[in-house]
Amino acid sequence: SLCTAVTFWLILKWEENYDQPHSTRWLVLIAYLIGVSVGVHLLNLLCIVAIVLVYYFKTSEKPTVWGSLIAVGISALIIAAILYGIVPGIVKVGGWFELLFVNGMGFSFNTGLIVYIVLLVSAIAWSVYETQNGTREWAINISLLLTIALTGMPFIGHKASGVIFGIIVLALIGAYLFSSSIPEKFKPSKWLLNTIMLCVMTITIGYSSYAVIVIRSTANPPMDQDSPEDIFALGEYLAREQYGDRPLLYGQVYSSEVALEEREDACYPLYNVKGKSYGRKEKTSANEKDSYYVMDEKRSYIYAQNMFFPRMYSPDNRHKSEYNHWVGGIKGRKVPYNSCGQMKTVTVPTQLENLKFFFRYQVGFMYWRYFMWNFAGRQNDLQGHGEIERGNWITGINFIDKMLIGG
């Protein structure tokens, strides 16, 4: 809350001093706070939408609805660049360097990481210098591309697809920057490029606060979840892999069966490999070189029964009971399922039942109830699980409350 409040206060300070020299410093400070807040709570990134809108309305002579929508779209791209680019990208690219120097060249642990940090700092410093004082266009463009690549911004995705996507993005940016056929008025000014690089620098500095996690873990404290002592364990920690995965827009439900494939008279579950988990290999002799080994593959199982916007997905029996309770009895629909030559029937919830759970529990109980506690009123302070007499929200207006929770 503090980071969010201070961040929005700073954009108002920028608006107040918009026409003053060096007003850009407020934007750079905002970028630093956003980088710091990534280590506190990712919700602070939502301030970016409001920040971009304030910037648009202040700098635009005639704001329009379409202009506002474009500003919101730009803010979404900025959030994606930070959340899916810089945050996992720095760790991802650092991991590539670490594997190259340790497994590929035989250096000791952390050598690749140190080389990467030196290169990243040098690239950012070079790009800031070139965009501020440089006169050679090719040097400005190369420093920008190098900084973007080393921060991992374009490498969104897993395995080879993420690398290919990143190379394509870098190629498109390079073609745009180096193109002589694009008029200068459609190219970013040095001031804008310098501001962007300063913001990238301060976001990276703020984000570096996560180094405390590694330092703390190296001391082996009693509470050391996932023990993020190296770049690979830190990546899994930042990705919150300890909390598992869940389908958001499309995926399995609680009764879904894993899809099977018959090979050589046996059935095997189908899955996608999202990546590999690396760990430090224990030495068997003093002369053995440091190296990393693949501990496990990060698998994502493929399910035979899927639906759009699945809300009831947990196979835990306790959760199944709650699903049934909040829906008011799940009848579902029967779906045929070919289990390696044997036809079976799986009962999955209907989309109507799925939406009932969404609106009654996720929206009504877990969001709207808390919202109205703060802005309307609270029935009592008893812990409730959906009962009519425990912990609901009220308005304080008698006839409305009778309709909500009875007399």
Please tell me what each predicted stretch does:
Residues 1, 84-113, 142-166, 215-233, ...:
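Membrane-interfacial interhelical loops
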Residues 35, 41, 82-83, 200-219:
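Transmembrane signal-anchor helices characteristic of membrane glycosylation enzymes that use polyprenol
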Residues 217-407:
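Lumenal/periplasmic acceptor-binding loop at the mouth of the active site in multi-pass
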Residues 120-139, 160-199:
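Cytosolic-side transmembrane helix boundary signature
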Residues 17-35, 64-77, 136-147:
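Short hydrophobic alpha-helices at membrane interfaces in multi-pass membrane enzymes
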Residues 1-9, 27-30, 43-49, 172:
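Alpha-helical transmembrane segments of multi-pass membrane proteins
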Residues 7-26, 53-64, 125-135:
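Membrane-interface transmembrane helices that cradle and orient dolichyl/undecaprenyl
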Residues 43-55, 88-91, 165-169:
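Transmembrane-embedded, aromatic-rich helix segments that form part
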